[in-house]
């Protein structure tokens, strides 16, 4: 009676649901879960590895520490596993927060801080406050992200937004044939022209470009590796940061730990294939990771007092949830120990 109860009909039985099956608590009906809690479920319900660690999960849930300032051995153990299993060696700066939208928010704040400080070092003031983004993008429902998200208008209309440059999203059409390739290359050229126009109009005001490796809510839109290579080249040429929003595409759902790890010369199916890996400067993560946040690379360190080195420049009360971190640690260990990425690839090829 106190909430907008417009969700699905089944009542989730937390104890009896199992594997990929949701059990309705009212009558025991089982439903094959094709929803996976908005892609946040990773190893199903009541996985044996989770159940083996019920006591640990219960213990860390009894009190919620403020991890920005108070550290625990469980936090350190989680970071060890995260580093070992999922953090790329080119993204070693880490920040945790609760919520995927807030993860993106802080990616943007890092970029604004980086660009504005660079401008100030050159004597340029009041510049570095815009984000390039794409049509049909979904990056969240919070402050800055409202200016990026443009899928269902009900999620953004009537809320104040920034007028940041919105770029054509040159996604592939399937099946991929000669005409589809001609069409997508034309759309890529248009997108690059729009990016260059925004840069030419105000060359010092673009802090970053953000893109989902695969647009999820926008329509399951896939892009060519060649396009990501163009974005990387433009980011280096025009001195803005390249952000991949991996909230929905991370932690194995594509057969790689992160979707952008498919963008390699050996895996690229473009003609010709890309020559270099278009690695991001920042990625945002959430959903399957349980705890949300960002990873950032070496370009951030081009600014001495960047947001990762200045105390409280980016921060939150809790710095993520310790319970979520411990659960994510167990998930990562399960993905690693059961070789689930290989299983995802094999299943994907079969389908």
Regions found by a protein language model. Give the residues of each.
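Conserved N-terminal phosphate-binding loop of PLP-dependent enzymes in the Aspartate aminotransferase
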Residues: 1-351
């Amino acid at each position: 009676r106190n909430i907008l109860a417009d969700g699905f009909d089944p009542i989730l039985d937390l104890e009896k649901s199992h594997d990929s099956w949701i059990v309705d608590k009212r009558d025991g009906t089982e439903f094959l879960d094709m929803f996976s809690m908005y892609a946040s479920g990773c190893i199903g319900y009541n996985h044996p590895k989770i159940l083996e660690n019920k006591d640990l999960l219960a213990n860390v849930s009894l009190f919620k520490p403020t991890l920005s300032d108070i550290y625990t051995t469980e936090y350190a153990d989680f970071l060890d596993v995260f580093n070992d299993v999922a953090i790329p060696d080119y993204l070693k700066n880490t920040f945790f927060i609760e919520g995927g939208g807030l993860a993106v928010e802080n990616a943007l704040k890092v970029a604004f801080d980086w660009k504005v400080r660079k401008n100030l070092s050159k004597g340029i003031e009041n510049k570095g406050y815009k984000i390039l983004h794409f049509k049909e993008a979904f990056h969240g429902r919070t402050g800055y992200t409202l200016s990026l998200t443009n899928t269902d208008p009900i999620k953004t209309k009537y809320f104040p937004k920034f007028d940041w440059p919105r770029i054509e999203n040159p996604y592939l059409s399937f099946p991929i044939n000669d005409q589809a390739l001609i069409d997508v290359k034309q759309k890529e050229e248009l997108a690059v022209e729009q990016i260059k126009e925004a840069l030419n109009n105000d060359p010092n005001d673009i802090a970053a470009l953000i893109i989902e490796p695969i647009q999820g809510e926008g329509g399951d839109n896939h892009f060519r590796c060649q396009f990501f290579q163009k974005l990387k080249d433009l980011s280096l040429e025009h001195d803005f940061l390249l952000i991949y929003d991996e909230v929905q595409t991370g932690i194995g759902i594509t057969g790689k730990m992160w979707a952008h790890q498919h963008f390699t010369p050996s895996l690229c199916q473009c003609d010709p294939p890309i020559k270099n890996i278009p690695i991001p400067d920042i990625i945002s993560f959430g959903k399957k990771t349980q705890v949300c946040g960002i990873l950032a690379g070496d370009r951030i360190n081009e600014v001495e007092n960047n947001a990762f080195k200045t105390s409280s420049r980016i921060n939150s009360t809790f710095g993520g949830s310790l319970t979520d971190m411990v659960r994510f640690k167990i998930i990562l260990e399960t993905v690693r120990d059961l070789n689930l990425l290989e299983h995802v690839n094999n299943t994907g090829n079969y389908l």
